């Protein structure tokens, strides 16, 4: 990375719209630390230029002819793993495709403000530049195992949940144990390595705070639910926190738990520059669950969640940080480790078992 400090970040722009290629190039090159070394009109052209130009970062449109963004990403990760920032639409189809791409190994995404050809793309300039710079410093991780999992039927989930409630008598009561997972850049891929490996009868509730804008967290929750034995969905105000269920904070809202054990959503100011913020959820749940809370911090930029993890460790709770060896961006977990707030530091593929073990003790 030392040479990247001295030279601009080399970016390849892949989009089937000539207008969007021009706009993205202008926006990126408005920053002196970025240079666009090439553009491609579709996925096949993009793949050839990745191999030819060997860029530091690729921006990749989701919807393209010949070879779409997802297919192109799969080939890039197989043939020359490169940090990729997806450029997607706000449509349901665009969100679903984006989540699949993030699960496969894309570093991050930028949503087009107004459809596939966005005349106002300039409003996303700062986000685009920041995410390309972050991607240049990221480590591309080829994620395949969770993506290939067979979907789990709703009937299997209901049977497992009914069995859990018979065994524990939880019903709608507050679960004895709670797991809070926080993540940012690279988080969707990490979550696809963890959530599908949790048992349907996990004797704990699970809350997930992923830094992500509105419109995409629902697709993330739906995709995880399809692949997982445990039930997963986007949290709604008033939802009870239950054992055997994963609730994902909706983009644009802080997620809290009220005195009755129900989800409360808050659009107060961003904390650490993000909303939802992991530390806001920590402040809400730590006084209730105390040492019965399990905190997990995964890949991501910044330090959100570190304060909550330090308080949880002090309270006697179990804390897990993702190891640098599997992080896309070793930021949030690094701060947790440096604070001495992690009881375990584990590669992502070991975290589901660690969670299951932690909530099964006491």
From Swiss-Prot:
GO terms for biological process: chemotaxis. It catalyses: [protein]-L-glutamate 5-O-methyl ester + H2O = L-glutamyl-[protein] + methanol + H(+); L-glutaminyl-[protein] + H2O = L-glutamyl-[protein] + NH4(+). Disulfide bonds: none annotated. One of its GO terms (cellular component) is cytoplasm. Its EC number is 3.1.1.61, 3.5.1.44. Contains a C-terminal catalytic domain, and an N-terminal region which modulates catalytic activity. This is Protein-glutamate methylesterase/protein-glutamine glutaminase. It comes from Symbiobacterium thermophilum (strain DSM 24528 / JCM 14929 / IAM 14863 / T). The lineage of its organism: Bacteria, Bacillati, Bacillota, Clostridia, Eubacteriales.
């Amino acid at each position: 990375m030392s040479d990247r400090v001295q030279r601009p970040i080399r970016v390849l722009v892949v989009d089937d719209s000539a207008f969007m290629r021009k706009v993205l190039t202008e926006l990126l090159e408005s920053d002196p630390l970025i240079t666009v070394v090439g553009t491609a009109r579709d996925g096949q052209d993009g793949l050839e230029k990745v191999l030819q130009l060997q860029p530091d970062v690729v921006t990749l449109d989701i919807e393209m002819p010949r070879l779409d963004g997802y297919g192109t990403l799969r080939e890039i990760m197989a043939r020359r793993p490169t940090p990729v920032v997806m450029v997607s639409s706000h449509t349901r189809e665009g969100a679903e495709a984006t989540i699949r791409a993030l699960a496969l190994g894309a570093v991050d995404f930028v949503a087009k403000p107004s459809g596939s050809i966005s005349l106002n793309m300039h409003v996303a300039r700062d986000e685009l530049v920041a995410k390309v710079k972050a991607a240049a410093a990221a480590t591309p991780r080829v994620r395949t195992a969770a993506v290939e999992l067979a979907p789990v039927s709703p009937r299997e989930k209901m049977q497992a949940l009914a069995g859990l409630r018979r065994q524990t008598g939880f019903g709608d009561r507050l679960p004895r144990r709670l797991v809070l997972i926080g993540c940012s850049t690279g988080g969707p891929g990490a979550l696809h390595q963890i959530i599908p490996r949790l048992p349907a009868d996990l004797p704990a509730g699970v809350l997930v705070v992923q830094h992500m804008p509105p419109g995409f967290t629902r697709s993330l929750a739906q995709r995880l639910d399809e692949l997982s034995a445990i039930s997963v969905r986007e949290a709604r105000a008033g939802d009870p926190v239950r054992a055997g269920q994963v609730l994902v904070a909706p983009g644009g809202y802080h997620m809290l738990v009220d005195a009755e054990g129900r989800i409360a959503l808050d659009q107060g100011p961003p904390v650490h520059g993000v909303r939802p913020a992991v530390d806001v959820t920590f402040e809400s749940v730590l006084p209730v669950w105390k040492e019965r809370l399990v905190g997990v911090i995964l890949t991501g930029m910044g330090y959100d969640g570190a304060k909550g993890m330090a308080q949880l460790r002090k309270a006697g709770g179990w804390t897990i940080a993702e190891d640098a060896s599997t992080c896309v961006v070793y930021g949030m977990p690094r701060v947790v480790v440096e604070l001495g707030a992690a009881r375990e530091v584990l590669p992502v593929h070991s975290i589901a078992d660690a969670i299951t073990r932690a909530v099964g003790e006491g």
